UniProtKB/Swiss-Prot annotation:
Subcellular location: Cytoplasm
Protein's recorded name: D-aminoacyl-tRNA deacylase
Role summary: An aminoacyl-tRNA editing enzyme that deacylates mischarged D-aminoacyl-tRNAs. Also deacylates mischarged glycyl-tRNA(Ala), protecting cells against glycine mischarging by AlaRS. Acts via tRNA-based rather than protein-based catalysis; rejects L-amino acids rather than detecting D-amino acids in the active site. By recycling D-aminoacyl-tRNA to D-amino acids and free tRNA molecules, this enzyme counteracts the toxicity associated with the formation of D-aminoacyl-tRNA entities in vivo and helps enforce protein L-homochirality.
Enzymatic reactions: glycyl-tRNA(Ala) + H2O = tRNA(Ala) + glycine + H(+); a D-aminoacyl-tRNA + H2O = a tRNA + a D-alpha-amino acid + H(+)
Lineage of source species: Bacteria, Bacillati, Bacillota, Bacilli, Bacillales
CC terms in the record's Gene Ontology section: cytoplasm
Keyword Phosphoprotein attributed: no
Pfam hit, one: Tyr_Deacylase
Motif Gly-cisPro motif, important for rejection of L-amino acids: chain residues: 137-138
Keywords, sorted A to Z: Cytoplasm, Hydrolase, RNA-binding, tRNA-binding
C-alpha cells in the first residue's frame, strides 16, 4: 500500500456536486492498493499514520501527532498511485489491485482507523471525486507499507 498524507487545515470531497466528506484540521490520506497488499499492510499504516508527529507544539516544533491534536482523516482511494510511467506517455495501472479487492481493503483500512479512535470521513470508492484541501505547511509525506 502507498499513501500520500497531506496535513490540512480543512478538506472536503465532492461527488456529483454533493459534499460527501469533510474535515477540519487533520490529514488527507490518498490510499493506493496493489495486488500483494494484505491486512498486515493495513495494520502497519494504521499504527503509523495517527502517530506521526507532524503537528506543531507550543514551541512551533513538529512534536505532536494526529491523536495528540484530536485531528481527523479524510480518506480517499487513489489507484493512480500505482501508475507506471516508465514507458510511453500514458500511465498503465497494472500494479493497482482489482477494484473488488481494493474496495474491501480500503474499507478495512478506514474501519481500522476508526477502531483506533480517529474520526474518518471518506470519499466514494470508484467514483469521480473532487478533493479540496487547504494544505497546512505544506506538510506532505509518502509512505509505502513495503518499505518497513
Amino acid at each position: 500500500m502507498k499513501v500520500v498524507i497531506q496535513r490540512s487545515k480543512e478538506a472536503s470531497v465532492t461527488v456529483d456536486d454533493q459534499i460527501i466528506g469533510n474535515i477540519s484540521s487533520g490529514f488527507v490520506v490518498l490510499l493506493g492498493i496493489t495486488h500483494e497488499d494484505t491486512y498486515e499492510d493495513i495494520q502497519y499504516l494504521v499504527s503509523k499514520i495517527p502517530n506521526l508527529r507532524v503537528f506543531e507544539d507550543e514551541n512551533g516544533k513538529m512534536n505532536l501527532s494526529l491523536k495528540d491534536v484530536g485531528g481527523s482523516i479524510l480518506s480517499v482511494s487513489q489507484f493512480t498511485l500505482y501508475g507506471d510511467t516508465r514507458k510511453g506517455r500514458r500511465p498503465n495501472f497494472m500494479q493497482a489491485a482489482k477494484p473488488s479487492v481494493a474496495e474491501d481493503l480500503y474499507n478495512k483500512f478506514n474501519t481500522s482507523l476508526i477502531d483506533e479512535g480517529i474520526h474518518v470521513e471518506t470519499g466514494e470508492f470508484g467514483a469521480m471525486m473532487d478533493v479540496k484541501l487547504t494544505n497546512d505547511g505544506p506538510v506532505t509525506l509518502i509512505i509505502d507499507s513495503k518499505d518497513r
